[in-house]
Structures are given as C-alpha cells and as structure tokens.
Design a protein with these regions (language model features):
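Short flexible coil/turn linkers enriched for glycine and charged/polar residues
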Residues: 14-15, 27-28, 94, 120, ...
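Short beta-alpha connecting loops at secondary-structure transitions
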Residues: 18, 337-342, 366, 407-420, ...
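Accessory alpha-helical DNA-binding modules that contact the DNA backbone or grooves
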Residues: 30-31, 42, 46-147, 475-614, ...
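Duplex nucleic acid-engaging cores and interfaces of nucleic-acid transaction enzymes
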Residues: 49-52, 59, 63-311, 315-417, ...
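Long, charge-rich intrinsically disordered scaffolds of nucleic-acid metabolism proteins
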Residues: 96, 395, 401, 406-476, ...
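Low-complexity, acidic/Ser/Thr- and charged residue-rich accessory regions of DNA metabolism proteins
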Residues: 139-149, 208, 227, 244-263, ...
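A glycine-rich phosphate-binding loop feature that marks nucleotide/adenosyl-phosphate handling sites
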Residues: 176-184, 312-316, 373-377, 397-404, ...
Length: 708
C-alpha cells in the first residue's frame, strides 16, 4: 500500500484508480482498451495517466528489489547498522541507494585495499588524530609492500582518500553544492571538425547546472562526441573544502592534503559523471516527450479523403519518380520524368507534357511533392505546369522515412515489381491521403519531427513513440477490410502474427462482414477479440454498431436503450431522443456505467466520425514563393513542421522552413513552444528577419505592432 500511496501522491490519482489500472493490466488488458472501455472503473483516466501509473509501479518495484538486494549484501558483511538500514529504506532514487551502498560494494583491488591488507589502517587513524612525529610512528608499519616511511604514509593517505571519497554524507553534500553552485562549461577543441560552425555558440560557453536546458545538454554531448568541444565544470572548490574540514576535529597539513586529493581526484570526477548522467537523462526525457508530442500531432493531421493524388519524388540526375494513386490509395500508374537540371531543355519540355498528360488522364487533384533533394527546383517546375492546368494544387510533403519504407520488406511485398524510388513516390502520395495509415509503416524514429533523436536512448525513444502510435491508431479506429498489417498491429490486443492472419483471411475468404466473424481469424482468441473488437470498424456490416466504436459487449445495452426509447432506426428523431436522455438514470436502467453510456451515445450520434477531421488539413498551393520575394513585416500562412525547445519550424512555401523563435510566439512568458503551437497547425505569421546569404528566414506569431 505504501507503493500505491507514493504513486497517488506523485500522479494525483486515487488508490482505487491505481488498483483498478494495475489489476486490469495484470489480467491482460491493454492501455487503449482500459482508457476507452473501462472509463467507469478508472474514473475516466486517459492513456497517458494509465501509462504513468504502470510505469511508476514498475519503477518503484525495481527500486524496492534493489534495496532488498543491497540490504542483504551489507547484512552479510555484518555492517548493516540501524541508521544505514533506515537511510537505504528511505532512499527515493536508485542513484541514492547506490551511493549508500558504495562503501560496501565489492570492488577491484585499489591502492587503499592493498594498504588496508598491509595493516596501515591504524596509521591512517593517527593522521586523523593529529599524531605528533607521524614519520617515527610510521616506522612500525613498514612491510614488503610498503618498505619505506614515505610508502607507509602514502598508503595511509590512500585509505583516508578512499574513505572520504566514499563517505555518503560528504558525497551528498558535494552533490548538493555542485547542483546549486557549479557551472558546466565548454570550449573549442577542434574547429576543423565543425566546418559549418554548428556548435559556434558553445566554443566559449558556461551555464549554472541548475539552469541548464535540455537541448543545450544534448548539444554539448554531441559536440563532445564529435570531437568539436571539450566539456568541463567550474566548482566552488574552496567552499567545498571548508565543508569537508568542518567534519574533522583536527586540522593539519596531512588532513588538508587528504581532503584535496579526495575531493579533486575522486569525489569531483564521480559527481561530474553523475551530474552529466542526470542532465542527459532529463534532457533525453524532454527530447523524447517533445518528439512524441510532435509525432502525435503529425499522425492526427486531417486526411485528404477521396482525392486522386500524384506523388512526386524529386531527384536531379536520376529523374523524378511519379506515382498516381486513386481515392483509396490504390496505385494507378508510375512514371519517371526529368524536370530539372542537369536534364536538357527537350527533356524538361517532355517532362511538362508528361505531367500534364497524367493529370488529365487520371483526373489528378493534388500533387504531393517530397521535400528532399531537388524539392525546390521540382516545386518551381510543378508550379509552372499548374499555370496551364486548372483546379490542381500541390503540397510539399515531409518525406522523412519514405526511403526507409520503400526499401522495407513491407513495401517489397506490396509492390514487388517496382523500384525503391517508385515505391517512395507512392508513399509520399498516400501520406497526404491518410497520414496515419502510411506513417505507421515506418519506424517512428525515421519520421524526423524531433530534436537530437539520434542522441537519446533508442530503447526509451522507441517505447515512447510506439505508445503514441498505438494510442492514436486506437483513438481513430481502423477499417479491418482495408488496413495494412502494419496498421492492424497497433490495434489493442493484436500483434504482427494476428495482423498478418487477418489480411490473409481477407484474401482467402473475402471481406469481413461482422465483428463476430473476426473470431474466425486464426490465433485471434477471446482476449485478443475483447481488446481489439471495439477499435475495428466494419463499414460493410449489416449491423450498424459494427461501423462504430461501440464495443460488442455493449450491444445488449444498446438494444435495450433502443427499446426503452422506441428507436427502430437511426434517423433524426432517434438522434433527438438520444440527445435528451439523462445519462445517470439511464445508465442505471441499462446496468452500465454513465461514462460508457456517454461514449455509446456519442458513437450513435456520429457513427462515421474521424477524430482527425477536427485537426488542420495541409495547405494547398498553386504558386511558388521565393526567399527574395519576402519582405519584413509580410503576413503569410504556414504549417508547423516541427516543434523544438527553442521554437518552431514553419513551412511558408519557400525551400527552407522558417523559424519562429520562442521569443516571437507570445507577449506573455511561455516555458515551451508547445504551449502555443503543435506540428500540423495552420498559423498566421509575419516575416521578422531575412538572411539571404544563409537562406534563412525568421518568423513571428506577433503582428509587427505587437512584436518586441
């Protein structure tokens, strides 16, 4: 129960909610299922809160297990005092447990170990007691390992240095002082390794550890790893020495030297490693959280349904790869054209005619242009062609990860006859039609909507991003008859094998026409059906409930509800009746929870609703904008492509995304850009600064008269 109380205090949830979540999880329920279909039991906890409870429970269990191991080992040594036992039991972090365990930990033989084995501990005690004529006293401790007085005193020194360096109280004091008062610094180590001067602001950098921002920590780590920067610390050494000296009754030159060695050779390097690790962990957590939030918004971008799209994968020498897909994402044709240099004039003219032919033949409505190599030149080419073709627009699509997908086993299986580049063009087109369905085919780490994602723990990053994808897929729901195995595998209760079995079943038996039929899929057992059924939509079913998010376990309640309200079919009259019900009393009548009833009614009122329709759709363009066309103070519309700790990057129709620095986001103080903007948002911006030489533009969310 003590563990539950800690979780409750930290997360602001009740003991009952914690018990419910952990019990349901132990029974095999998934986070999406608990969040959607067990709201009454959890008192409306969402996916993030449920995951936080599960994660903290695992963390506290691991901490308790480690404490148990450490206590047992120290007790075996016969050195477990009541005070030490209490300190370990009260420790709130694994790092604190390890600090307390350090003096008793088995370690490789050190100079201090050898000195203790040679019987020099009493000599070390004499140093602490300010023994007069220490050199004469040391003569009694000479041995084969320590044949001279100087050697013996040096050995005693080693014992004291290690003892002080491993003293838990002194280590904690040093740690707290460093946290409050020390600076982390960086200087230029090798300029030749930073030709573009990416790390220029860190060539002569210092910041209080207490004020260190996550993205700066990761920048220092990367610069150090690349050999560009040398990272160090500035400590209040004199202040620390005074604290250490206060611990000793005696004071002499020997003790001063012992303290100096313990602090500078042992304690500070150890604390620096700990601080660097902690700063990195905090920075990684922040970067992962930001990447996850960006990914969530990217996956929720409104799909452009029912449009014929031409995917345009730009390239210089090898030509642009085109792919036309119909309203359902089915590939109609692929082609290669040579629209930009080094192509000859005749090739470029032929490319124009071929693009116009494809647009007319397949009634293309939108062209999706990948934002990679040759994107700028390809955009200009497309814009020129569209002057001659009415009612067609283009969109610049973030193609990050498209090449990863196109070379994957999934893409090879889907389009075995096509080249990698043509598969990539199909992926770019489909990303516009249904971003979620297409992006789930790609490792989320390859999508590129974060900062320093390659510098953080890849295991933690994958876990966090997978959670985001799972959450969004289940919140949106999946058409079981059109979904790819990649999309199905993110549905609660389903795995790779079951997802592939569903697709195979469709291929062999035809369309699935009811949720009950799902049970016939091989390896899809009762628990998997319970977890997955509500998230799987079947538009072809005669039972309209199968087309909604209503779970089959609630079908009897819906039938009873319709009987009580006199509803025979879902028409306007039925909708009016549903809107007027008293949720609490009706839920009691139906013997279900009020939250469950609210969700049922919401699904009945909007059976085909798509969560993503409430989010912004991509901006369609028909003409290209050049950096030279921009003017300070000019008002533009744009789409947020990426959010980072220091601002947001916005696509305003020029080759490079413009940066809105955090200082240009609000007249009020904000801690983070995500308080104001999200990936996929449509924003009105004003040009704040133009750098033609570096081809950079700075933007502002504040109108010129508001900007500071």
């Amino acid at each position: 129960m003590e563990k539950y109380e800690k979780i409750a205090q930290e997360l602001g949830v009740s003991l009952k909610q914690i018990d419910t979540v952990l019990t349901l999880t132990a029974e095999g329920s998934t986070i999406p299922f608990i969040a959607r279909y067990r709201k009454d039991a959890t008192e409306n906890l969402d996916e993030v809160a449920i995951k936080a409870i599960i994660d903290m429970d695992k963390s506290l269990t691991a901490l308790a297990d480690r404490k148990e191991t450490v206590l047992a080992k120290i007790e075996e040594l016969g050195k477990l005092t009541p005070a030490l036992k209490e300190a370990i039991e009260q420790a709130e972090k694994l790092a604190d447990v390890e600090e307390l365990y350090l003096p008793y930990k088995e370690k490789r033989r050190t100079k201090a170990t050898i000195a203790r084995e040679a019987g020099l501990f009493p000599l070390a005690r004499m140093i602490l007691q300010d023994q007069k004529e220490l050199e004469r006293a040391a003569e009694e401790f000479l041995s084969e390992a320590f044949p001279t007085v100087k050697d013996a005193i040096s050995g005693a020194f080693d014992i004291l240095v290690e003892a002080i360096a491993e003293d838990p109280q002194l280590r904690n004091l040093t740690y707290q002082e460093i946290r409050k008062h020390s600076l982390i610094t960086s200087s230029l180590k090798d300029e030749s390794k930073d030709e573009k001067q990416v790390f220029q602001i860190y060539y002569d950098f210092s910041e209080k550890i207490a004020n260190m921002q996550g993205y700066r920590t990761l920048a220092l780590n990367r610069g150090e790893k690349l050999g560009v920067l040398k990272v160090g610390f500035e400590h209040p050494v004199d202040r620390l020495i005074r604290h250490f000296e206060a611990r000793f009754k005696s004071k002499n030159s020997y003790i001063e030297e012992v303290i100096n060695q313990a602090l500078k050779k042992k304690m500070l390097p150890a604390m620096e490693r700990r601080i660097r690790t902690e700063l990195t962990e905090v920075a990684e957590d922040g970067a992962i959280q930001l990447f996850s939030e960006n990914l969530r918004h990217l996956l929720l971008i409104a799909p452009l349904k029912g449009r014929v799209v031409l995917g345009f994968d730009p390239a210089f020498r090898t030509g642009a790869k085109l792919a036309v897909v119909d309203q359902t994402g089915k590939m109609l044709t692929t082609q290669v054209i040579y629209p930009v240099a080094p192509a000859k004039a005749a090739q470029i003219e032929a490319a124009k005619e071929e693009l116009k032919r494809l647009i007319r033949q397949y009634s293309v409505e939108i062209i999706a242009i990948g934002n990679g190599t040759a994107s700028r030149e390809s955009e200009a080419f497309v814009a020129e062609v569209l002057k001659e073709v009415p009612n067609v627009s283009y969109v610049i699509v973030n193609e990050s990860g498209a090449s990863v997908y196109s070379a994957s086993e999934l893409a090879r299986h889907e389009f075995p006859e096509l080249t990698v580049e043509k598969r990539s063009a199909i992926s770019i087109a489909r990303r516009l039609q249904d971003p979620l369905a297409e992006l789930v085919k790609i490792d989320p780490k390859s999508i590129g909507v974060g900062q320093y994602q390659h510098d953080v723990s890849q295991k933690k990053l994958s876990e966090s991003l997978d959670f985001v994808v799972d959450t969004v897929v289940n919140q949106v729901g999946v058409n079981i008859n059109t979904a790819s195995p990649a999309l199905l595998s993110h549905v609660a209760g389903l795995n790779k094998t079951i997802s592939e079995n569903i697709v195979k079943y469709r291929e062999e038996e035809g369309l699935i026409t009811s949720r009950a039929q799902i049970k016939k899929v091989p390896r899809l057992g009762a628990k998997a059906f319970e977890q997955a059924a509500g998230f799987l939509r079947i538009p072809e079913s005669e039972n309209f409930l199968d087309r909604t998010g209503v779970h089959p376990e609630s079908y009897p309640a819906v039938k009873k509800l319709f009987t009580l309200l006199g509803i025979r079919e879902m028409d306007e009259e039925a909708q009016a009746k549903l809107k007027q019900i008293d949720t609490v009393s009706m839920a009691q009548e139906l013997e279900i929870g009020p939250e469950t009833l609210k969700d049922i009614v919401a699904d009945l009122l909007k059976p085909g609703r798509d969560l993503r329709d409430s989010f912004d759709a991509p901006v369609l363009r028909q003409d290209v904008l050049d950096l030279k066309d921009l003017k300070i103070g000019q008002k533009l519309e744009g789409v947020v492509r990426n959010v980072v700790d220091f601002g947001a990057f916005v696509d305003i129709g020029i080759h490079e995304d413009g940066l809105i620095h955090i200082s240009q986001m609000s007249q009020q103080f904000i801690k983070h850009p995500s308080q104001v903007v999200s990936v996929g948002d449509l924003v009105t911006v004003w040009v704040y600064k133009i750098d033609l030489e570096r081809e950079k533009v700075n933007l502002s969310l504040l109108a010129p008269h508001e900007s500071n």
